[in-house]
Amino acid sequence: MARARRVKRASVTDIYRGCKQAGTCPPDVLNKVEQTTIADKILKYGSAAVFFGGLGIGTGRGSGGATGYVPLGEGPGVRVGGTPTIVRPGVTPELIGPADVIPIDTVTPIDPAAPSIVTITDSSAVDLLPELETIAEIHPVPTDNVDIDTPVVTGGRDSSAILEVADPSPPVRTRVSRTQYHNPSFQIITESTPLSGESALADHVIVFEGSGGQNIGGSRSAALDAAQESFEMQTWPSRYSFEIQEGTPPRSSTPVQRAVQSLSSLRRALYNRRLTEQVAVTDPLFLGRPSRLVQFQFDNPTFEEEVTQTFERDVEAFEEPPDRQFLDVVRLGRPTYSETPQGYVRVSRLGRRATIRTRSGAQVGAQVHFYRDLSTIDSEALEMQLLGEHSGDSTIVQAPMESSFIDINIDEPDSLHVGLQDSTEADDIDYNSADLLLEDNIEDFSGSHLVFGNTRRSTTTYTVPRFESPRNTGFYIQDVHGYNVAYPESRDTTEIILPQSDTPTVVINFEEAGGDYYLHPSLKTRKRKRKYL
């Protein structure tokens, strides 16, 4: 006969949890959990009236509580092991009164208009030198309505007097501040054409100084030559001499801790050199079509090779793979991406070889880690464009061919030419004239081209030829819808008058086709509008 298994009885807390909601709890369980027994009520109500704290009951110290042990019929008790209290007399505090007030003597202000005379008085000691009288007279400048600040004297009788005279008109402190706000919707681009010798706006200014060029004028005397001074040219920093420092962009958006935890198990499986063979693949088919490196097969464009692939082989047949690195590979895992210590992206696939096959059909082979590192992808380089670019960035001045320096002083005449004119006054000399600055070159625009349009649209070019005609004004129109270009030319030629007939011309108008008479206007009837009453 099988012995009945002993079932553990439920605790009071478990019974209370099940019966409290249904309201079927026994009285003993309910009183024990809610602490409503007779003993609980005695402790609850008795603790409110009696306090036994601080007596040391049950502590094991034997101190007798806060008041100590008190023998029967005697006075207050003595605490066992207590340190006696030493009574000291009280210390009387010393009173600290206010500090002594030092009087300040008021000195009468000195009148600036009165003379200052200092007289030396006789001392009690015997003077060996004769008595001297020192008189110092000061004659101040007479002033009217001058504000005099009263001096302030600090110190006692034995200290020297210090006069602090304030400036009647202190300098006014000014402060200039400038605030500039950037408005992205309003931009002003200010550029000027750089001129060599006037502004260093251009980055490259090359000046070739040789034997060419003309120098007109110069110094008037030898004293002026000695007064001339050569200044050393200083190199100003270029306006484009700045460097753009770009921050290093983040390599990944995954936090470092999470990435390390997720790749720790993967690294142990891929980079264990004792259990996994490391093979670096150089064929680019490894990234998109790795199955073509294992065996010859037809491509299926609808099949994505992003999953684990299993290759079945015949035991008796020997098939040479397209790539010798994938020999005897029967399983090739899905691609995984990682980062190398050099910062490159690595594509990895974990494969397994079936090198040995037993009689039972089990395949034995090593695990292989196929990987390929991707090359660096450089960021796109954006060509920087200049704001307000003009064609004066590079200025080349060649002295023998293009430079001409003219130094003419129009305020003072040359000493070599004074006396050759009728008058020696500076106003009457022809050299003191602004006409010397005018250019005498005559421009000829014959055979030039006229271009109409702007840079955005296609331009139209018209050639203005120069031809001879007996007429005073000639018109040359190249296009019907274009512009009329008039090129006036005057020549001393005889005007040709064509002969005309003296017989007057009679014009006959016919209103109707085929009519042979002319009806007088008075014979035509006019229609009148009738008035209805």
UniProtKB/Swiss-Prot annotation:
Coiled coil: none
Disulfide linkage: C19-C25
Principal cellular location given in the protein's record: virion
GO terms classed as biological process: microtubule-dependent intracellular transport of viral material towards nucleus; symbiont entry into host cell; viral penetration into host nucleus
Post-translational modification: Highly phosphorylated.
Cell compartments where the protein resides: Virion; Host nucleus; Host early endosome; Host Golgi apparatus
Key words of the record: Capsid protein, Cytoplasmic inwards viral transport, Disulfide bond, DNA-binding, Host endosome, Host Golgi apparatus, Host nucleus, Host-virus interaction, Late protein, Microtubular inwards viral transport, Phosphoprotein, Viral penetration into host nucleus, Virion, Virus entry into host cell
Job of this protein: Minor protein of the capsid that localizes along the inner surface of the virion, within the central cavities beneath the L1 pentamers. Plays a role in capsid stabilization through interaction with the major capsid protein L1. Once the virion enters the host cell, L2 escorts the genomic DNA into the nucleus by promoting escape from the endosomal compartments and traffic through the host Golgi network.
Quaternary structure and interacting proteins, as annotated: Interacts with major capsid protein L1. Interacts with E2; this interaction inhibits E2 transcriptional activity but not the DNA replication function E2. Interacts with host GADD45GIP1. Interacts with host HSPA8; this interaction is required for L2 nuclear translocation. Interacts with host importins KPNB2 and KPNB3. Forms a complex with importin alpha2-beta1 heterodimers via interaction with the importin alpha2 adapter. Interacts with host DYNLT1; this interaction is essential for virus intracellular transport during entry.
Protein name in the entry: Minor capsid protein L2
